[in-house]
């Protein structure tokens, strides 16, 4: 099987994680895909478990892996490091799965530079900035200051959307999930 790497990026609150979770519960998703678990230096949110959502590490641990060229991509986002390790990608490729990377635009650029056409990319957009703010407030995981900071960064993130192979506006969740499933199906058959 020729494995692909699918890069999924979106501003915080656009619905990326919810769409991926729903996709991975579908027949095509659970049988053919695996999400690479990223390393991060941020604190776990309530309910997050180490090695399920992220590998939670200290700044020193992250920087040590970085100095050993242990990441295929990394970035500092919202004052925290995030990165996908080479070991994680090797682990998933050995399972014969297509890999999904939930990463930002900086990581997407780095990954495409390494994997070229083998890396497909999707950018998920919110229907509007007002809706995005409502979603961030509704999930009740960030302070007002953090939400304000995230909203300040949105324009910069969205300015890179044209670098992606496919743009998906997540307005209606069911329709967005259907479009995402079609995109994945078409791209493993091509």
UniProtKB/Swiss-Prot annotation:
Domain of life: Bacteria
Entry keyword Mitochondrion: no
A molecular function GO annotation: ATP binding
Chief location bin: cytoplasm
Disulfide bonds: none
Catalytic activity: GMP + ATP = GDP + ADP
Pfam families: Guanylate_kin
The Guanylate kinase-like domain, residue ranges: 3-185
HAMAP family: Guanylate_kinase (MF_00328)
Family, as annotated: Belongs to the guanylate kinase family.
Functional description taken from the UniProt entry: Essential for recycling GMP and indirectly, cGMP.
Protein's UniProt name: Guanylate kinase
Species whose genome carries this gene: Francisella tularensis subsp. holarctica (strain LVS)
């Amino acid at each position: 099987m020729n494995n692909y790497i699918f890069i999924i990026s979106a501003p915080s609150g656009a619905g990326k994680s919810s769409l991926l979770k729903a996709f991975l519960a579908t027949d095509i998703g659970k049988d053919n895909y695996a999400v690479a678990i990223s390393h991060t230096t941020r604190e776990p949110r309530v309910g997050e478990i180490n090695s399920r959502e992220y590998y939670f590490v200290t700044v020193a641990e992250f920087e040590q892996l970085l100095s050993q060229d242990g990441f295929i991509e990394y970035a500092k986002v919202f004052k925290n490091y995030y990165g996908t390790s080479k070991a994680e990608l090797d682990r998933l490729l050995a399972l014969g799965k297509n890999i999904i990377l939930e990463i930002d635009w900086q990581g997407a650029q780095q990954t495409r530079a390494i994997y070229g056409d083998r890396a497909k990319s999707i950018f998920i957009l919110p229907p509007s900035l007002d809706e995005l703010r409502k979603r961030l407030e509704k999930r009740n995981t960030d302070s007002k200051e953090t939400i304000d900071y995230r909203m300040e960064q949105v324009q910069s993130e969205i300015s890179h959307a044209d670098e992606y192979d496919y743009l998906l506006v997540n307005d209606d969740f069911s329709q967005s999930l259907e479009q995402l499933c079609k995109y994945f199906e078409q791209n493993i058959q091509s």
